[in-house]
C-alpha cells in the first residue's frame, strides 16, 4: 500500500513515536478498500509478475478506479506452481496463473462487478471443485504460517506496511521492558533451534556469545542459501526483509553486539535489493543506527554479497569470506561465539531463525513452545520440489509427517505415479523411502533414520527416479563445491563420485557397494567441516534403502527406473518385464513393415497376440510422449502386428539361435511364464516338455481371463507358434498327483523350471464365507472357462477391485444374473483394475459400489441370502501411496444378494512341495530360492 505523508517519515526517538506512527498509518488506511495484491517473488516475476502489476495499474487508471482500488506487490504466497498469484483483498479472492490478457476481465468482473472469474480459480484436484478464497486452497489451508504470516499483506520494502502489522513491536518490547538476559532466557524457554541445518539451540548460542569476554561483538545473518531446490531464505528476504532485520536487532541487543552483517549471495539480486531498501528505510526512521528509539542501544548493519560458494554456508568459511579471505572452514574450537569475525565473539544464525524471533517475543515462550514436538519447537519452512503436484513454500509445525506434507499439502505425485523417496536436508541430507511416510519431521526423528533437517529442502521422487543417479547428482554437487582444504572431502568425494559414475555407465563391479559404504563412513568421521561430514549421506542412505537398485546396475547392468542412458535404450523398453523393443516395432509398423515388427516383438515375447489384449502395458506409463499429451498405444500396436499375421494366414517359421542339444528341460506349468521360458529354451536348442495340470495350455490366460476379452483362438495361435520351437505340451499332468520332481529327474530331464502360477483364493475371513453361493473368483472363472455349468443367482455381488473382479462381474452378467454389483473398499482412483476394463463394466450397467466393505455373509439353510456391508472413508495414506479405508462407525447395512464372488487377490498353491524333499516355503507363501538365479535348494 502507498507510503504515508511527510508526518509518517520522521525519526522515531521513543517507543511512543513508534506506537504513534503505527496508529497514524492505520488511521490513514481503509481496511475495506480493495487492493489487488500480486506476488512479486522471483518465481512469479519469472512468470511475468511485474508486467502483470503494471497492467493492473494501467487498467485501474483507465477505469477511473484509482481512489477505489490499490495495487500492491507482495511476498511469496508459497504456491509457486500456480504463479503468478493474484489475491483480491479484503475478500481474499484467490486467482492463479493470471496473465496480462486476463487483467481487463478481472478489473471489470471482480473490481467493478463483484463477480468471480471462474476460470482463474484454483481447482482442488481431490474434489474437482473450484476454490474461491485463499484460505480454502488445500496447500495453504493445512499450513501454520508464522514466519510467512505477513506475506500477501505487506509490500516488501514498505516499512509502514510492516509497522502496521506490529512490525518492530517486539524490538520495542525488549528495549523497554526486558533485560538482555531475559531475552536470552525467553528464547531458551521457547526451545527455538537454529533453522540453518544443525539445529543448535538458539538461546544457548546467544548465551555463549554474550558470556564471551570482549567489548566488540558481532551479529551475522547467514543468508548463503545454496542447496539445490531450496529457496526458503530467499523468499523470506524478498517478501519481508524487515522481519529478518527485527530479529537481528533483538539478537544484537541480547548479546551486546553493535555491528552486524547479512551475508547473502549475489545470485539473489531481488533479495539484496529489498534488504538494501529495508536497511535504508530503517535507518531513516532511527530503527537502525545510534540510540535506537531513544534507548542506549545502537546497532549498525551491512550487507556482504557472497560469490555463491556452497561451502560459505559453513559458519567459519562465511566469516572468512566477510573478512575478505577465501571462504574456507577452519578447525573448531574456538567457536565463533568465542572468536569469530576478526577474532571477536560472533553470533551466527540463518535467515529463518532470525525471522522466528518477532513472533516468539510477542507471543511469549510458552505459546511458541506449544507448537511442535518435545525436542523441536515452532514451525519450519520447507521448499517442496520435485515430482509433486504443488511445488512451492510451505510452513508447518515441527512434527508434521512426511505423508501430510506430500499428499495433503503437496497434492500427491503427478500422473498417478507412486511415491518413491524424499530427499531431506539438501545435497547433504538423506533420502526417506515410503516406509517413513509417517515419520514426524523434526531434528531427532530425521537424524535417527540417517537424514537431516538441513535448511528445509524437500525433493520428492517418484518411481521414474533412479536412486543411484540421484546420489551421483548430489555427490557431484558437493564434490564440486568442496573447498579442498581437507583430504577426506577433497579426494574421498572424488573417488566416490568416480565409482558412482562407473556404476551408472554400466561399469560397476562387485565390491563397489561395500567400498562406497566404507569410504563414506571414513569421510564422515574425518572431514574438517559440516560439508564433508554430511556429503556422503545421499550415497549411504540410498544404499541403505535402495540397495537392490545398486545391485541391478552392477550385476544385471540395468537401471530399473530407466534413467541411466548407458543402461537404458528407452524408458518403455526398460519398464517392460521382457524388455520388448517397443521403439523398434512401433517404428517398423509406422513404415508398414508389419512382419518385421512382429519378428522384433518375438525376439523377447512370443505371446504377441495375447499381450496385445491382456497386458497391463506398464510401458505406456513410462512413455515419453505421455509427458506431452498421451502415451503411444504400444499395446494396441502389438495387437495389430499379431492380428495382421493371423489374417494373412501364414504363421512365421521357427527361428533357432543355436543347434539342437541333448539336455532336456522340463517345465511345470503352461501359463505365460512357462510358455515364454519354453520358447526361449527351445530357440537355444534345448528339447522342452511342458507338464500342465489343466486340460488346456495357457494357465490363467486360458482359465482366468474370459473368452470375450481374450479369445481362445488367439491363445491357441500363440501356443502353436511356441510349439514350433522344439516344445511339447502334455496336459492333465499335475505335479504331486501324476508325477513328482524326482520322477522328472529320473526320466533324464537335466533341469526343471517351475511356473505354477497363482491359482489359489485368499479368504475374506468374515463369518459365512463357506456358505453355498459363495464362489471364489479364480475358481469361478476357471470353471466357466473350462465349460462347466456354473449357476449364479439373480443378484450377484463381486468383492474386490482388480482385473479378476471385473472379469468375474462381467462373466456373471453373461451367465444370466439380472443385477451385478462390485463392492470395493476404496474409490475409483485407487482401483487397481485396468481403467479400460472398468469402463467396459460400467457400460454393461454393472454397479460399482465404492467405499464399501463386507463384514458378514447372511445365510438361510446354509445358502447365501444377503451380505452385511459397512461404509468406508479414506484415512491416511499407506506405503503404496493409497489412502487407507477406514470403517464408518454405525454405517452398516444389508445388501440383498444370492451369489457372492470374493476376489481379493490370488496366491500360489504349494501343497505338492514337501520339506522332506528339500523344498522350503517362505513366510510370504512362496518357494525359497536364490534371489538372483531363482534356483531352489534342489
Regions from the language model: what does each represent?
Residues 770-794, 877-938:
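FAD-site-proximal beta/loop scaffold in flavoenzymes
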Residues 143, 272-398, 410:
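Hydrophobic alpha-helical positions that pack around
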Residues 121-189, 343, 349-364, 568, ...:
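Flexible inter-domain linker/hinge segments
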Amino acid at each position: 500500500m502507498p507510503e504515508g505523508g511527510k508526518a509518517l517519515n520522521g525519526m522515531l526517538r521513543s517507543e511512543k513515536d513508534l506506537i504513534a506512527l503505527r496508529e497514524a498509518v492505520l488511521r490513514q488506511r481503509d481496511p475495506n478498500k480493495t487492493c489487488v495484491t500480486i506476488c512479486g517473488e522471483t518465481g512469479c516475476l519469472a512468470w511475468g509478475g511485474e508486467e502483470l502489476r503494471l497492467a493492473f495499474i494501467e487498467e485501474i487508471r483507465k477505469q477511473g478506479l484509482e481512489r477505489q482500488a490499490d495495487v500492491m506487490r507482495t511476498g511469496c504466497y508459497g504456491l509457486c506452481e500456480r504463479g503468478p498469484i493474484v489475491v483480491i483483498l479484503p475478500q481474499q479472492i484467490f486467482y492463479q496463473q493470471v496473465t496480462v490478457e486476463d487483467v481487463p476481465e478481472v478489473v471489470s468482473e471482480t473490481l467493478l462487478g463483484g463477480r468471480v472469474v471462474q476460470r482463474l480459480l484454483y481447482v482442488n484436484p481431490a474434489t474437482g471443485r473450484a476454490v474461491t478464497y485463499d484460505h480454502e486452497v488445500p496447500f495453504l489451508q493445512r499450513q501454520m504460517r508464522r514466519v510467512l504470516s505477513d506475506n500477501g499483506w505487506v509490500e516488501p520494502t514498505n516499512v509502514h506496511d510492516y509497522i502496521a502489522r506490529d512490525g518492530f513491536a517486539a524490538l520495542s518490547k525488549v528495549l523497554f521492558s526486558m533485560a538482555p538476559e531475559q531475552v536470552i532466557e525467553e528464547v531458551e524457554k521457547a526451545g527455538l533451534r537454529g533453522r540453518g541445518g544443525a539445529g543448535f539451540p538458539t538461546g544457548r548460542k546467544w548465551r555463549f556469545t554474550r558470556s564471551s569476554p570482549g567489548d566488540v561483538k558481532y551479529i551475522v545473518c547467514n543468508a548463503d542459501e545454496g542447496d539445490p531446490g531450496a529457496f526458503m531464505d530467499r523468499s523470506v528476504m524478498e517478501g519481508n526483509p524487515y522481519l529478518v532485520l527485527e530479529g537481528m536487532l533483538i539478537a544484537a541487543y541480547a548479546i551486546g553486539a553493535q555491528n552486524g552483517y547479512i551475508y547473502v549471495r549475489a545470485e539473489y539480486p531481488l533479495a539484496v535489493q529489498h534488504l538494501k531498501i529495508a536497511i535504508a528505510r530503517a535507518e531513516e526512521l532511527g530503527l537502525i543506527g545510534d540510540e535506537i528509539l531513544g534507548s542506549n542501544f545502537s546497532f549498525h548493519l551491512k550487507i556482504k554479497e557472497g560469490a555463491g560458494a556452497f561451502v560459505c554456508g559453513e559458519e567459519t568459511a562465511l566469516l572468512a569470506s566477510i573478512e575478505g579471505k577465501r571462504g574456507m572452514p577452519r578447525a573448531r574450537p574456538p567457536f565463533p561465539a568465542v572468536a569469530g569475525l576478526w577474532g571477536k565473539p560472533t553470533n551466527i544464525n540463518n535467515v529463518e531463525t532470525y525471522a522466528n524471533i518477532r513472533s516468539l517475543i510477542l507471543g511469549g515462550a510458552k505459546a511458541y513452545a506449544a507448537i511442535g514436538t518435545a525436542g523441536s519447537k515452532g514451525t519450519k519452512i520447507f521448499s517442496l520440489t520435485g515430482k509433486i503436484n504443488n511445488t512451492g513454500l510451505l510452513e508447518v509445525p515441527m512434527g508434521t509427517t512426511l505423508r501430510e506434507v506430500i499428499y495433503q499439502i503437496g497434492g500427491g505425485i503427478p500422473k498417478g505415479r507412486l511415491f518413491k523417496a524424499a530427499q531431506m536436508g539438501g545435497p547433504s541430507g538423506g533420502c526417506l523411502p515410503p516406509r517413513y511416510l509417517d515419520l514426524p519431521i523434526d531434528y531427532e526423528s530425521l537424524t535417527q533414520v540417517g537424514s537431516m533437517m538441513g535448511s528445509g529442502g524437500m525433493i520428492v521422487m517418484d518411481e521414474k527416479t533412479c536412486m543411484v543417479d540421484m546420489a551421483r547428482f548430489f555427490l557431484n554437487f558437493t564434490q564440486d563445491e568442496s573447498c579442498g582444504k581437507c583430504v577426506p572431502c577433497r579426494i574421498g568425494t572424488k573417488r566416490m563420485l568416480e565409482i558412482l559414475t562407473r556404476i551408472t555407465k554400466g561399469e560397476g563391479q562387485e565390491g563397489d557397494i561395500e567400498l562406497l559404504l566404507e569410504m563414506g563412513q571414513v569421510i564422515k568421521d574425518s572431514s574438517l567441516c559440516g560439508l564433508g561430514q554430511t556429503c556422503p549421506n545421499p550415497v549411504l542412505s540410498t544404499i541403505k534403502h535402495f540397495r537392490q537398485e545398486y545391485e541391478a546396475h552392477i550385476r544385471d547392468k540395468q537401471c530399473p527406473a530407466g534413467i541411466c542412458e548407458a543402461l537404458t535404450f528407452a524408458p518403455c523398453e526398460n519398464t517392460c518385464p521382457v524388455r520388448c523393443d517397443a521403439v523398434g516395432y512401433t517404428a517398423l509398423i509406422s513404415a508398414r513393415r508389419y512382419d518385421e515388427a512382429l519378428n522384433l516383438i518375438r525376439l523377447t515375447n512370443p505371446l504377441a497376440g495375447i499381450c496385445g489384449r491382456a497386458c497391463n502395458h506398464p510401458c505406456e506409463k513410462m512413455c515419453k510422449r505421455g509427458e506431452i499429451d498421451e502415451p503411444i498405444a504400444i499395446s494396441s500396436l502389438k495387437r495389430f502386428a499379431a492380428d495382421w499375421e493371423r489374417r494373412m494366414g501364414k504363421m512365421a517359421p521357427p527361428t533357432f539361435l543355436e543347434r539342437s542339444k541333448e539336455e532336456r528341460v522340463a517345465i511345470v506349468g503352461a501359463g505365460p511364464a512357462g510358455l515364454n521360458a519354453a520358447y526361449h529354451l527351445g530357440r537355444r536348442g534345448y528339447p522342452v516338455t511342458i507338464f500342465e495340470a489343466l486340460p488346456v495350455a495357457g494357465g490363467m490366460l486360458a482359465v482366468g481371463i474370459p473368452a470375450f476379452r481374450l479369445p481362445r483362438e488367439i491363445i491357441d495361435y500363440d501356443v502353436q507358434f511356441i510349439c514350433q520351437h522344439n516344445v511339447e505340451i502334455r496336459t492333465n499332468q499335475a505335479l504331486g498327483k501324476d508325477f513328482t520332481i524326482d520322477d522328472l529327474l529320473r526320466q533324464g530331464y537335466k533341469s526343471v523350471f517351475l511356473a505354477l502360477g497363482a491359482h489359489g483364493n485368499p479368504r475374506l475371513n468374515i463369518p459365512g464365507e463357506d456358505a453355498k453361493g459363495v464362489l471364489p473368483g479364480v475358481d469361478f472363472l476357471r470353471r466357466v472357462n473350462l465349460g462347466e455349468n456354473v449357476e449364479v443367482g439373480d443378484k450377484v455381488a463381486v468383492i474386490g477391485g482388480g482385473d479378476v473382479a471385473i472379469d468375474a462381474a462381467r462373466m456373471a452378467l453373461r451367465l444370466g444374473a439380472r443385477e451385478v454389483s462390485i463392492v470395493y473398499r476404496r474409490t475409483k482412483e485407487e482401483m487397481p483394475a485396468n481403467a479400460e476394463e472398468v469402463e467396459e463394466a460400467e457400460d454393461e450397467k454393472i454397479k460399482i459400489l465404492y467405499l464399501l466393505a463386507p463384514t458378514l455373509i447372511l445365510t438361510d439353510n446354509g445358502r447365501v441370502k444377503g451380505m452385511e456391508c459397512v461404509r468406508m472413508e479414506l484415512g491416511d495414506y499407506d506405503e503404496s501411496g493409497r489412502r487407507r479405508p477406514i470403517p464408518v462407525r454405525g454405517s452398516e447395512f444389508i445388501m440383498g444378494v444370492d451369489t457372492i464372488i470374493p476376489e481379493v487377490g490370488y496366491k500360489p498353491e504349494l501343497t505338492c512341495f514337501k520339506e522332506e524333499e528339500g523344498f522350503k516355503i517362505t513366510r510370504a507363501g512362496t518357494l525359497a530360492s536364490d534371489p538372483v538365479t531363482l534356483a531352489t535348494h534342489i
